[in-house]
Amino acid sequence: MTTTTTAPALPTPIHDGLGNGTTYERSIPRPVNPFSNRVPGREIITVPNFTLESGVEMRNVPVAYMSWGKLSPKANNVMIICHALSGSADVSDWWGPLLGPGKAFDTDKFFVICMNSLGSPYGTASPVTAKNGDYSEGWYGADFPATTIRDDVRLHKLVLDRLGVRKVAAVIGGSMGGMHVLEWAFFGKDYVRCIVPAATSSHQSAWAIGWGEAQRHAIRSDVKYKNGRYGFDDPPILGLEAARMTALLTYRSRDSLERRFGRDTGNKKKAKNKGSETLPSNSTPIHSQGGADETPVAFDRADSNFAAQSYLRYQAKKFSDRFDSNCYIALTNKLDTHDLARGRTRTITEALSLIEQPTLVLGIRSDGLYTLAEQEQIARTVPNAKLREIVSDDGHDAFLIEWSQLNWLLVGFLHESLPDIMQRAAL
């Protein structure tokens, strides 16, 4: 991949203070790819060497993060927030109503931090960052190595070490972030005190793997994908938009879409009697208008007859403006590797039983991607866990929507699990 954007300012070396001679670099870089400005104010710590689970060694690995609040004198009031698939380190962008004084992510009591995952376009090493941190080598693109949820957590632990963190009070996240939460638990209760996994799984199911493959296939089918060897100036937008549409349908439920759109056409002059609807003049007796010829069909064509179609196309376009196709493939492949038992135990049940921390599992009955049954399995098997339901018919996305319920559930759990932090005065 190539770009003409400005190279970053040189970072300042900082020793980690751990006595092992490792040097990290901390900087706020200038734009180097189309996604660099999407998360204003993020900071970067560069880890000089990092070996992935696969055995691949990466050099000069940037990790983007954002933080709020103050680290306590004992460096033990850290709250880690783990982002979902398409999220960034900016918690205020996607869980903003939970962040701030007196809220679940109380910045008067906690040092709140969110670190960006490997493969994401928002600052951490990914297909849109320079190979081994060297811009003369070009961008990773399709050559970005496969990474795992466990890789992310190990890398993020190095960032916390660099920042002087001694103990983590709580780790909270949903969906892919919930997978990270569960992996953090394996650092032990002496390091991580409590966890909150939401709308997630102990291992990626065949159902979720199948949906991910359908999305990747949509991207690879775009003629502009070119086996991942595309440029920033002409990316495979249509494939990425198709993938996003598919994903959106797994994030919501049938009932939520029916309630919101029904058979609405978005036309204020539509007949009151829905039975009198007539087909538009451009209707055609095929399922996909894109299959009529070899000409790519843009998703912003004004041939949407139903509001549900317009919604999907609008959301897909918004997404393609802020995300990268190779990053999407890297992240969805990462999800498929998720398995708490891998390399630890023979079964998922045995792996879950090793988690010692107080655990609040949050599930959504209408979630068709990471089902309530999967949350029940986690809560039933983790020794010190309890399950609470987010009541919503909005499907998987309810963990990002039902802020009032989330805040109430989280604050109650944190008071119960961390009374020393929750009851003390603001820092």
UniProtKB/Swiss-Prot annotation:
GO molecular function annotations of the record: homoserine O-acetyltransferase activity
Biotechnology annotation for this entry: Fusaric acid is phytotoxic to plants such as cotton and banana. It has been shown to induce programmed cell death in plants. In addition to a mild toxicity to animals, fusaric acid exhibits acanthamoebicidal, antioomycete, and antimycobacterial activities.
Statement: the UniProt record of this protein carries the keyword Transferase: yes
UniProt-listed GO biological process terms: homoserine metabolic process; methionine biosynthetic process
Family per similarity comment: Belongs to the AB hydrolase superfamily. MetX family.
Gene3D superfamilies according to UniProt: alpha/beta hydrolase
Biased amino acid composition, Low complexity: 1-13
Alphabetized UniProt keyword annotations: Transferase
Pathway: Mycotoxin biosynthesis
Stated name of the protein: Homoserine O-acetyltransferase FUB5
NCBIfam families linked to this entry: homoserO_Ac_trn (TIGR01392), PRK00175.1 (NF001209)
Annotated spans, Disordered: 1-35, 260-297
Active-site feature positions: 175 (nucleophile), 367, 396
Catalytic activity: L-homoserine + acetyl-CoA = O-acetyl-L-homoserine + CoA
InterPro entries noted in UniProt: AB_hydrolase_1, AB_hydrolase_fold, HAT_MetX-like
Its biological purpose: Homoserine O-acetyltransferase; part of the gene cluster that mediates the biosynthesis of fusaric acid, a mycotoxin with low to moderate toxicity to animals and humans, but with high phytotoxic properties. L-aspartate is suggested as fusaric acid amino acid precursor that is activated and further processed to O-acetyl-L-homoserine by cluster enzymes aspartate kinase FUB3 and homoserine O-acetyltransferase FUB5, as well as enzymes of the primary metabolism.
Residue ranges of every copy of the AB hydrolase-1 domain listed in the record: 77-400
EC number: 2.3.1.31
Residue ranges, compositional bias (Polar residues): 276-287
Top-rank lineage group of the source organism: Eukaryota
Induction, as annotated: Expressed under high amounts of nitrogen via regulation by AREB. Moreover, components of the fungal-specific velvet complex VEL1 and LAE1 act also as positive regulators of expression. Finally, the pH regulator PACC acts as activator of FUB expression after the pH shift to alkaline ambient conditions.
